[in-house]
């Protein structure tokens, strides 16, 4: 399992539009993707579950990937989270 930390830089947090982009990208990987924040852990491949984390601007989260492409998945998804600006 590979874990990468990311900080939400988007002014409006991880609202529906960037969250759906994240989920779409996460589904491209064969690895299991899990997002952890504030002691909660949810599937990174579920928009509904991701929204339950209430990921606001400045919040730290942990992207966990387990599977064949775990290293690239965790790295690219962490970069994606930090690339969102709105």
Swiss-Prot record:
Instruction: State any GO CC term.
Output: cytoplasm
Mostly located where? cytoplasm
Task: Kindly list the places in or outside the cell where this protein is found, as annotated in its UniProt entry.
Answer: Cytoplasm
Q: Domain of life of the organism in this record? A: Bacteria
Q: Which PROSITE patterns match?
A: PTS_HPR_DOM, PTS_HPR_HIS, PTS_HPR_SER
* Location of the HPr domain: 1-86
Under the heading InterPro entries, the entry gives: HPr, HPr-like, HPr-like_sf, PTS_HPr_His_P_site, PTS_HPr_Ser_P_site
Q: Which NCBIfam families match?
A: PTS_HPr_family
Function per UniProt: General (non sugar-specific) component of the phosphoenolpyruvate-dependent sugar phosphotransferase system (sugar PTS). This major carbohydrate active-transport system catalyzes the phosphorylation of incoming sugar substrates concomitantly with their translocation across the cell membrane. The phosphoryl group from phosphoenolpyruvate (PEP) is transferred to the phosphoryl carrier protein HPr by enzyme I. Phospho-HPr then transfers it to the PTS EIIA domain.
Family per record: Belongs to the HPr family.
Output this protein's name.
Phosphocarrier protein HPr
Organism from which the protein derives = Borreliella burgdorferi (strain ATCC 35210 / DSM 4680 / CIP 102532 / B31)
Q: What is the lineage of its organism?
A: Bacteria, Pseudomonadati, Spirochaetota, Spirochaetia, Spirochaetales
């Amino acid at each position: 399992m590979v874990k990468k930390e990311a900080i939400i830089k988007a002014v409006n947090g991880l609202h529906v539009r960037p969250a759906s982009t994240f989920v779409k990208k996460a589904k491209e990987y064969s690895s299991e993707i899990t997002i952890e924040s504030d002691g909660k852990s949810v599937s990174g491949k579920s928009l509904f579950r991701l929204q339950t984390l209430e990921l606001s601007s400045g919040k730290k989260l942990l992207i966990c990937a387990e599977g064949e492409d775990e290293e690239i998945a965790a790295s690219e998804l962490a970069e994606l989270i930090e690339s969102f600006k709105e």
